């Protein structure tokens, strides 16, 4: 792996590895990584407990996307806080495998995310893109509703990613 920050999604269907855009969307990536590692205070899980482990992919629309990160498993849950969108001109929904924040409108990001099956340009500047699948798009495409995210591991490669 090149220097960078990565998320390894260990699912019931296999592994997905995503390169995280920590330089272009530092707030969004920081939130995601902190929840994944259990370092961010939230209303759902005690600090020190990885937030995403065991959650389901609660919404799957074939030929569109898979969505996860809801602690209720319904799409209505979150960590108990919201944060602003973080758009970057270089990050678009222009290909399969884009990792983006799910939300209910501007400034309503929390813990829910989705990964695309196809390019979805109509989502640009509505949902924060913060990563791209580099391995396992076949797994993304194989996931069905209620498959589980067994664990989410953050991988740091190089000095900048470890900072």
Predicted regions and their residues:
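Cyclophilin-like peptidyl-prolyl cis-trans isomerases
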Residues: 1-163
């Amino acid at each position: 792996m090149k220097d960078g920050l990565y998320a390894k999604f260990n699912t019931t269907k296999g592994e997905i590895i995503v390169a995280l855009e920590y330089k272009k969307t530092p707030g969004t990536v920081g939130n995601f990584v902190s929840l994944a590692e259990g370092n961010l205070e939230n209303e759902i899980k005690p600090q020190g407990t990885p937030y995403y482990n065991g959650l389901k992919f609660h919404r799957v629309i074939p030929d569109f996307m898979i969505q996860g990160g809801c602690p209720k498993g319904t799409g209505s849950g979150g960590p108990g806080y919201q944060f602003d969108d973080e758009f970057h001109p270089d990050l678009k929904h222009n290909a399969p495998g884009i990792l983006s924040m799910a939300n209910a409108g501007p400034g309503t990001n929390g813990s829910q995310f989705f990964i695309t099956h196809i390019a979805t340009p109509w989502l640009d500047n509505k949902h924060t893109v913060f990563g791209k699948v580099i391995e396992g798009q076949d797994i993304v495409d194989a996931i069905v509703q209620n498959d589980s995210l067994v664990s989410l591991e953050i991988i740091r490669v190089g000095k900048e990613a470890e900072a």
